[in-house]
């Protein structure tokens, strides 16, 4: 049995929705145990509420538990072309895992969201840098998801990983095409994890 963690941060719910789609895809794979968790919120509760943050039900992960999984699929919104501060703070606490090589050889993949499209690919590839320092095997999705070829509408999605475009005010929710790409990413990573660890 391969253990897959979908680990995310979501302020307004876009990445949370994508995380559930990623997990749904991963659960299609026989031999995959899939768990969804989120990183801790670093914003004071009153500021989070004032900013319109969405309360989420996923359990909160600890950095140390990352070593328990065969694959980790990270989801983060874009903040100026980088991962969110909450995800960065969480990953900055993995120094002990790095020192012991606890994540070496584990699969790592990334999905993201952005307001208007700018920075979505940069967010994924800049997150890969942290995964590389841990010795993780980075898993992009390539162009196997057919939705990536659809240019008839505005949508997220890259060969690096699934993405969604939230709109400048956050009112746009992930489209069916974006969720389909996210499901593909989950299924693809879980399939590889089962092959390697099953």
Curated annotation (Swiss-Prot):
Example GO molecular function: NADPH dehydrogenase (quinone) activity
Q: Which domain of life is it from?
A: Bacteria
- Which residue numbers delimit the Flavodoxin-like domain? 4-189
Cofactor requirement: FMN
Which InterPro entries would you find in this protein's record?
Answer: Flavodoxin/NO_synth, Flavoprotein-like_sf, Flavoprotein_WrbA-like, FMN_Rdtase-like_dom, NQO
Binding residues for NAD(+):
12
The leader peptide range reads none
UniProt EC number: 1.6.5.2
| Pfam hit, one | FMN_red
Q: Which Gene3D superfamilies match?
A: 3.40.50.360
Protein name as catalogued? NAD(P)H dehydrogenase (quinone)
Q: List the source organism.
A: Salmonella arizonae (strain ATCC BAA-731 / CDC346-86 / RSK2980)
């Amino acid at each position: 049995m391969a253990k897959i963690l979908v680990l995310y941060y979501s302020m307004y719910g876009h990445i949370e929705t994508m995380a559930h789609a990623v997990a749904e895809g991963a659960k299609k794979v026989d031999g995959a145990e899939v768990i969804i968790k989120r990183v801790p919120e670093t914003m004071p509760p009153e500021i989070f509420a004032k900013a319109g943050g969405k309360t989420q039900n996923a359990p909160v992960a600890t950095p140390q538990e990352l070593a328990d999984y065969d694959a980790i699929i990270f989801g983060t919104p874009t903040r100026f072309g980088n991962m969110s501060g909450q995800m960065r703070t969480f990953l900055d606490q993995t120094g002990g895992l790095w020192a012991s090589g606890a994540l070496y050889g584990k699969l790592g993949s990334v999905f993201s969201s952005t307001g208007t499209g700018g920075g979505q690919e940069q967010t994924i590839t800049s997150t890969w840098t942290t995964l590389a320092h841990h010795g993780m095997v980075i898993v992009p999705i390539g162009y196997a998801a057919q939705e990536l070829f659809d240019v008839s509408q505005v949508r997220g999605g890259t060969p690096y990983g699934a993405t969604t475009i939230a709109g400048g005010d956050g009112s746009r929710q992930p489209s069916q095409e974006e969720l389909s790409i996210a499901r593909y990413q989950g299924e693809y990573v879980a399939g590889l994890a089962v092959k390697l660890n099953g």
